[in-house]
């Protein structure tokens, strides 16, 4: 029996290229023998040198990769700084995932991953999850209670690990809905594309098991919520927030 390709997507610019490489390497290291991995990178300005290095590493891991240029001008009016004064680790590349239906017209389902994570298991079980009609699946955000109250929602996922039904997105015009929301409700957006996805897809959004996005952070809510403890055994460890493991101190 031939296994379907597992489509995996990242967004990155040059600043996050090294972290992209680590994330891909972790997936390759933990792949099952039968996994056919197809990587797509939404490229916001990765250098030719780094593209070649990442492509060579991926090929050595018997997977394929493509870099797709994205015109960041599409999101020139999208907010990057939050009302709290700014999130320095976020760039416009975070919004690129909203364009996936048109950037990857032949792909029906995809796993979207942030670059600030490591994978510790095969992605095949995640890719095979029964979405039961959902357009978006993700793990409940570590601070979901605050964000659901802020936006008037029932559910709120972390956008760092997503299972997306791109075929459903195309049928329902989700890409356009997201762009329209950015244009018309800019003042409501604090957490960038994550807010946009949760609002636009709220009625067609459901939760993944926590093991697929253990949101490890150096904050009190991280310790209290149990996400940091989960990170010791999780399939994916996601280093959320502004303080990353590679930062000094």
Summary of predicted features, one role per range:
Residues 1-249:
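Glycosyltransferase catalytic domains, chiefly GT-A lineage
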């Amino acid at each position: 029996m031939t296994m379907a390709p597992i489509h995996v997507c990242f967004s990155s610019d040059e600043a996050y290229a090294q972290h992209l490489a680590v994330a891909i390497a972790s997936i390759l290291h933990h792949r099952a023998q039968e996994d056919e991995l197809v990587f797509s990178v939404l490229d916001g300005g990765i250098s030719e040198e780094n593209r070649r290095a990442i492509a060579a590493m991926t090929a050595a891991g018997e997977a394929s990769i493509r870099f797709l240029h994205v015109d960041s001008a599409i999101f020139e009016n999208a907010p990057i700084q939050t009302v709290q004064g700014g999130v320095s680790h976020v760039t416009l590349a975070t919004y690129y995932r909203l364009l996936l239906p048109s950037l990857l017209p032949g792909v029906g389902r995809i796993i979207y991953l942030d670059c600030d994570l490591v994978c510790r298991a095969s992605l095949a079980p995640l890719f095979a999850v029964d979405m039961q009609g959902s357009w978006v699946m993700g793990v409940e955000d570590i601070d979901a209670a605050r964000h659901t109250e802020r936006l008037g929602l029932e559910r709120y996922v972390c956008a760092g690990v997503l299972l997306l039904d791109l075929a459903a997105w195309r049928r329902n015009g989700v890409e356009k809905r997201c762009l329209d929301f950015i244009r018309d409700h800019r003042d409501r957006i604090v957490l960038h594309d994550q807010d946009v996805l949760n609002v636009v897809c709220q009625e067609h959004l459901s939760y993944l098991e926590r093991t697929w996005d253990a949101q490890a952070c150096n904050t009190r809510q991280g310790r209290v919520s149990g996400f940091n403890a989960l990170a010791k055994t999780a399939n994916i460890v996601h280093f959320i927030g502004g303080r990353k493991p590679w930062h000094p101190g």
